């Protein structure tokens, strides 16, 4: 999973993945296999990519038990579909534990509308301009505002249009989202998007809107001696 790229990195039977099974040997090797007659791909390339996933410094990967060092790892394909990993090392743990604290952080209001046919991108951009100026007229100020043309610039921003000029699209979807402290302020964006049916460019449809509370996360380090784990066993009936 999260590896396939058709024609570049093909994965057979992605709908029937066989997840890896790890065996740890006494001589500090790891042997990986997957169940026979399952899809997916287990080889040097997939194992290496997974090892490096979301690791900033392979020589210093912090865990509660050890600082892992993957910088000298070797990954080798063996016979019968096995993959061998060896060379991992460890350093003394930091003495701290990571704690992720969730807290309420306002609301996100979102509205979407589609435009299709000839000149649809220009009409979607005009609709975005209408929304922006309507918010000014209503004296609405938000801590964050985001406008996307899904299929044109939603992933890489407006700068991508300079590098990859937009093709002649037959459809595009406008998404406008805001962050607000109050729920009622976040709800405004949905009403304004819906008003584009009659007060916006021609041919809009498929309006959807939502308001969600935001749960943000702050990650902090605390001394490990402040945490006292306990284990409770319960017998089921």
Where are these regions (language model features)?
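C-terminal non-catalytic interaction/assembly regions of soluble proteins
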Residues: 86-237
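A conserved active-site cap/scaffold subdomain adjacent to cofactor or substrate pockets
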Residues: 1-92, 100-103, 108, 112
């Amino acid at each position: 999973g999260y590896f396939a790229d058709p024609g570049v990195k093909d994965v057979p039977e992605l709908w029937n993945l066989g997840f890896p099974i790890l065996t740890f040997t006494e001589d500090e090797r790891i042997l990986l296999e997957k169940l026979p007659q399952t899809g997916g791909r287990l080889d040097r390339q997939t194992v290496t990519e997974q090892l490096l996933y979301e690791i900033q410094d392979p020589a210093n990967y912090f865990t509660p038990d050890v600082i892992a060092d993957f910088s000298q790892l070797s990954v080798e394909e063996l016979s019968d579909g096995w993959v061998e990993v060896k060379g991992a090392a460890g350093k003394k743990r930091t003495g701290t534990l990571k704690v992720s604290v969730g807290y309420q952080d306002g609301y996100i209001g979102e509205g979407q509308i589609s435009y299709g046919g000839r000149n649809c991108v220009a009409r979607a951009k005009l609709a975005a301009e209408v929304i922006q100026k309507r918010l000014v007229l209503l004296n609405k100020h938000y801590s964050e505002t985001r406008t996307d043309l899904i299929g044109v610039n939603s992933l890489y921003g407006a700068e991508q249009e300079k590098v990859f000029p937009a093709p002649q699209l037959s459809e595009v979807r406008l998404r406008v989202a805001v962050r607000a402290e109050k729920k009622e302020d976040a709800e405004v964006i949905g009403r304004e998007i819906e008003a584009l049916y009659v007060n916006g460019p021609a041919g809009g449809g498929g309006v959807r809107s939502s308001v969600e509370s935001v749960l943000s996360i702050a990650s902090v380090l605390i001394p490990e001696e402040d945490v006292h784990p306990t284990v409770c066993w319960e017998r089921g009936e």
